[in-house]
């Protein structure tokens, strides 16, 4: 098998490059940390200081907002922001969940925003096993680590109050509770590695299962990125949602149509009438007692997903009525753009390393090292190296067995 090595040479992997993750918000947020708050706040974008405050006994702080100013245990803190740094090796508990790093607290429109400020590599320890089963092969976990690092590197922006969130709207981040030795090893093995295009972090979208054909970014979001094309993906064939079937009650179909402002009376027939290269819905025709309407482009796929379908790579049966549910049959799960996690599993089980996995799902990209622009808190990329464009010496079986 062709093997590629990445040499860091004299360039250091970024250390002390912090990311700011919104982990909780509300009228009050409880924070537990064995250090007293600093005011004015230390810079959350700077490397952790060599000398830190002497830890006091563990404190629990109920943080609120009054008159646009933060309160600590009911007392006016005299500031709209506070940064609570940890002592070496300690952790911070925010709204009942434990994280590495510190916490930046902000008063924002009458609520408290709790933002975990954490080194990017420590952040990944709470992301990778939350997004991919930690029991999966090392190469698949390594690929997930690289795309997770790339995702957040592209979003670090000191001009904004935070860089990313902790939910599926961004990247799932569960903190210390999610950490697993296998994921930690994958993060360490790929330290600093990101996927780059045009000298910048690529948009490393991923989904659970492509259903055998990845979607292009253009067909799903209307944004054409050359390294996110529609392409055949035989390696996802063994996933649990490779094929699925769903029956949707007429009332649910009618409600979904109403959300898209389709007004054709009582629905009688709904079907996909045009698909993209990847087999995903690009036009849905809805016929009712008052006429016919069509949903096209991204609306077509969104409508199919609104029916409860795991993917828009689906067909609709046609007839629908009070006693006739709409039958939806399809393949895959998620939007289908970029890396397919079950495809990464299939490639890893066939002996491919993470470089070949990344190269297959993000063609035309390069592997780069993440560094930090001195004094800016912004990431920069160094040592670009093209990723392999296709898996090496691979039998296209699509099987996931060992």
Task: Cite the ranges covered by each PLM segment.
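Conserved, single-site charged/polar hotspot
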Residues: 1-402
